[in-house]
Amino acid sequence: RHCAITWLPGKTNQKFFQKLAYSIHHHDFESIDASQITVEGNQQWSLGVISAGLDSDVNERANRMTHFRGTTRYTLALLAELRAFPLHNYTVTIDSTKRTGSAILIAVGNGGQYGGGMKICPQADMTDGLLDITWVDPAPRRTVLRLFPLIYSGRHVNSPLVHTYRGSEISIESPDSMIYADGERIGPTPALIQVVPKIARVLLFREQMSPRNSFHRPRESRS
């Protein structure tokens, strides 16, 4: 028999766990997808968002700032990275489609949000057997600062700088970029990310659930 899993959130990505939580008095079970990540011959798993670029750069810097704690560390790391504003060159293959170029950020979402409620892949559905990809083009620092607050509502995807895709197998290659998943360091690219449908059976708590935190996202038409 398959065991169901649940969790007690204890780190910075509380919003992701709130999304998965529902029915403390009347518990329910749900089978959800997971992402299998292969880096340097090692396989790891993710239920949420996998990222490269600015997000992973911020995490790398924050992990070195051991004299600060909590959100202060990540805020200072973000400000430092925005000042340096490095760009990485990527080759990303989504199923059979390849894209090459510079990007500020690449996110691959099974779940759609991370980092305190940032909806980086707002249309991600953890039960559809697909991964959502968000690619952010290079832009002046001032433009990026204006774009950043829109991530909390998911409206950043309306910007011409942001491109969204969907696929079941994604490879990310870059000469100098790290991969992070669910806030944890995975390793350097190249990385192969594959969705495994309905592999995780989870126990959910209805008490904390709201319609906007549903597993199932209504699909909107995309250009």
Predicted stretch roles:
Residues 1-103:
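Catalytic core of DAGKc-family lipid kinases
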Residues 51, 55, 107-121, 185:
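Glycine-rich phosphate/pyrophosphate-binding beta-alpha loops
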Residues 55-58, 100-102, 113-117, 141-144:
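Short acidic/glycine-rich loop or secondary-structure boundary segments that cap or lie
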Residues 65-66, 121-124:
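Short, surface-exposed, charged loop/turn segments at secondary-structure junctions
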Residues 94-100, 125-126, 135-223:
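ATP/nucleoside-binding phosphotransfer catalytic cores, i.e., glycine-rich phosphate-binding loops
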Residues 106, 133:
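Rossmann-like adenosine-cofactor binding region
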